[in-house]
């Protein structure tokens, strides 16, 4: 079965749309994307998708919708996935490049928050960096 995919119309998708040259040429996507201010709509969509046979529930973007993820974790028995989208990644990378944040600490906190909110699966552009950091922290003698 397909995964339930809960996402909202909002600004976090801009970097991906720009990179993929997939910004709408006309009109907008509001007619089929949920209102980002309405968490209950996202939950209704999750429950509807489960009734239709979803095997996994995916919430994206991750950081802005931790409340939806947490609520789903308390009410849904399916595995919960969260997608740390390109906009979230770009914000971290830009701030780190400017020396405003410690990238490793921010990424670790962000992904930990997603796990704490109930994600069993985390999809992120930070995966390779996080794997490297985890391997370094598990190196004997350090």
Pin down the residues of each PLM region.
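A structural motif
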Residues: 54-55, 118-119, 127
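Active-site-adjacent beta->alpha loops and helix N-cap segments on the catalytic face
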Residues: 11-12, 61-77, 129-135
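Active-site mouth loops of central-metabolism enzymes
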Residues: 21-43, 92-108
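Conserved, mostly hydrophobic/aromatic
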Residues: 49, 114
């Amino acid at each position: 079965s397909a995964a339930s995919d809960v996402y909202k119309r909002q600004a976090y998708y801009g970097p991906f749309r720009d990179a993929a040259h997939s910004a709408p040429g006309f009109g907008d996507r509001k007619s089929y994307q949920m209102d980002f201010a309405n968490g209950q709509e996202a939950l209704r969509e999750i429950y509807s998708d489960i009734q239709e046979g979803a095997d996994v529930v995916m919430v994206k973007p991750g950081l802005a919708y931790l409340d939806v993820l947490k609520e789903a974790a308390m009410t849904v028995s399916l595995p919960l996935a969260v997608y740390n989208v390109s906009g979230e990644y770009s914000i971290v990378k830009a701030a780190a490049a400017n020396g405003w944040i410690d990238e490793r600490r921010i990424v670790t906190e962000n992904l930990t928050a997603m796990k704490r909110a109930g994600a069993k699966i985390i999809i992120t552009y930070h995966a390779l960096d996080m794997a490297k950091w985890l391997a370094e922290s598990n190196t004997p003698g350090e």
